[in-house]
């Protein structure tokens, strides 16, 4: 069984948990207390020099960065390739969505909310505009689409649903974006591990209360 170093409230950690559920892999979950500095202990830094979560250790093979872990789990354990198809064009669209999630959507969350939550900084209206722009892009991607990349659930949907659900608990109005809202409501029903994802979101919500 693979060791999984994580934090329940973390969106990237939740995307890995849902992906593992989708491919039927059980994770040996190891909770890290980042506020206590667990990630800086020498034994963890030896596993992951970047000392970040999530980190997976599968039979001695260590990997971090959630989207890399998602792809690894599907390629190694998926009974089919439906979550990350081998077709170059399908895979390219999934990769684009994953990079969009990492560099634009989730990044906009971090840039706007993290300074407020962790540094008690005032809200930055310019950073909020970046969130709105990211949701407009996602709304466009989802025009006429039930899924984020193609016609079935993929790792792109799983990564995006982890991010979008985090925006929901932060109080962002997802309903303003009709295509995103429709996709999100469906994703809640069809994404394996949604319940655990939502429990993690509620854990994270405490920072906003």
Curated annotation (Swiss-Prot):
Any GO molecular function: glutathione transferase activity
UniProt keywords, alphabetically: Lyase, Transferase
UniProt superkingdom: Eukaryota
Residue intervals of the GST N-terminal domain: 1-81
UniProt keyword Isomerase, yes or no: no
EC number: 2.5.1.18, 4.5.1.1
Binding site for glutathione: 10, 51-53, 65-67
Catalytic activity: RX + glutathione = an S-substituted glutathione + a halide anion + H(+); 1,1,1-trichloro-2,2-bis(4-chlorophenyl)ethane = 1,1-dichloro-2,2-bis(4-chlorophenyl)ethylene + chloride + H(+)
Keyword Lipoprotein: no
InterPro entries linked to this entry: Glutathione-S-Trfase_C-like (IPR010987), Glutathione-S-Trfase_C_sf (IPR036282), Glutathione_S-Trfase_N (IPR004045), GST_C (IPR004046), Thioredoxin-like_sf (IPR036249)
Gene Ontology annotations of biological process type: glutathione metabolic process
Domain GST C-terminal per the UniProt entry, residue ranges: 87-209
Alphabetical list of Gene3D superfamilies matching this protein: 1.20.1050.10, Glutaredoxin
Subunit structure: Homodimer.
Family membership: Belongs to the GST superfamily. Theta family.
Role: Conjugation of reduced glutathione to a wide number of exogenous and endogenous hydrophobic electrophiles. Has DDT dehydrochlorinase activity.
Name of the protein: Glutathione S-transferase 1-1
Organism whose genome encodes this protein: Drosophila erecta (Fruit fly)
């Amino acid at each position: 069984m693979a060791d999984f170093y994580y934090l329940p409230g973390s969106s990237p950690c939740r995307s890995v948990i849902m992906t593992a559920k989708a491919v039927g892999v059980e994770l040996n979950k190891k909770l890290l207390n980042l506020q206590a500095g667990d990630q800086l202990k020498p034994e963890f830094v030896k596993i992951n020099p970047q000392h970040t979560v999530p980190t997976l250790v599968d039979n001695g093979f260590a990997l971090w960065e959630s989207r890399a872990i998602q792809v690894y789990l599907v390629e190694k354990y998926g009974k089919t390739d439906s979550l990350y198809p081998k077709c170059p064009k399908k895979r390219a669209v999934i990769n684009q969505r994953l990079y969009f999630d990492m560099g634009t959507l989730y990044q906009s969350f971090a840039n706007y909310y993290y300074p407020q939550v962790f540094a008690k900084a005032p809200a930055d209206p310019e950073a909020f505009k970046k969130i709105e722009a990211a949701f407009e892009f996602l709304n466009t991607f989802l025009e006429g689409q039930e899924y984020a990349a193609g016609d079935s659930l993929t790792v792109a949907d799983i990564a995006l649903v982890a991010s979008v659900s985090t925006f929901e608990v932060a109080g962002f109005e997802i309903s303003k974006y009709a295509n995103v809202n429709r996709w999100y409501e469906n994703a809640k029903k069809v994404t394996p591990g949604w319940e655990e994802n939502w429990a993690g979101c509620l854990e994270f919500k405490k920072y906003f209360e």
